[in-house]
Amino acid sequence: MLLKAKNNNYMYAKTTVNIRKKPSKKSKNIGKVYWNEKIQTIKKANKNWYKIKYKKKNRYICAKYLKKKPYKCKTYSSPSSNSFKSFEDADCITDSTKLAHGRLKRKYHLDYRSGVWMVGNRYCIAVGSFYAGEKVGVKIDLVLSHNGRKHTLKCITADSKANKDTIKNHRVHKDGSVAEFIVKTSALPKKALLMGDVSYAGKQFKGKIVKIKVYK
């Protein structure tokens, strides 16, 4: 018997998960959802698979990668009213897989439109130690405000800003930037390179950072 999905018909991904055409790992891969993304469940197809709604069609996802509630975060107000967003070339980050920085770096893929490196659906950044210590792989949502509208930019820590270079209890860099983006300098749009500001790398980066949501 097929079981109805609970929790208002929504669940959340524990990690990056493939969406299948049929309830089998051998079935065609239709797409994917990322960590903590909300998924509309229809019912449980069997003990291992959920039937879900994906792009207006019925698809399937492995049940063990879903959870009933979203991951919790701690929200901070931005310590800076500056819209400036600095950048760091990925070549400045170690390639050594003996360190967490290097292991995460192996997962990088480039957003060719902006020149900013990503892991999954999250942009790679460095922030002050107030938010994540010196840890890499910490998921952070930056809430930006531009022309009176707010939007969320999903990020992940790939490096940390040195305490000697930060102010306001290590929450903001001395140059006024809250987040420093990890980039491939040669792939940056010309204006972003000229201004030294990732805000000019794409519309998703525009605006002031008003909230910083840190997932623990």
Each language-model region and where it sits:
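A generic structural signal for beta-strand entry/edge sites
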Residues: T16, K47-W49, V178
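Short, solvent-exposed loop/turn positions at domain surfaces
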Residues: S24-K28, V127-G128
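Residue-level recognition of short, solvent-exposed, well-ordered loop/turn junctions
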Residues: K28, Y34-E37, K135, K174
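SH3-family beta-barrel domains
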Residues: M1-N18, G31-W35, K43-A45, K67-S77
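Short acidic, glycine-rich loop/turn motifs
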Residues: K21-P23, Y54, L142-G148
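SH3/SH3-like beta-barrel superfamily modules
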Residues: I30-L66
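A structural signal for short, hydrophobic beta-strand segments that form beta-sheets
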Residues: A13, Q40-K44, T157, I209
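Solvent-exposed, well-ordered loop and adjacent helix/strand elements within mature globular domains
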Residues: T75-K216
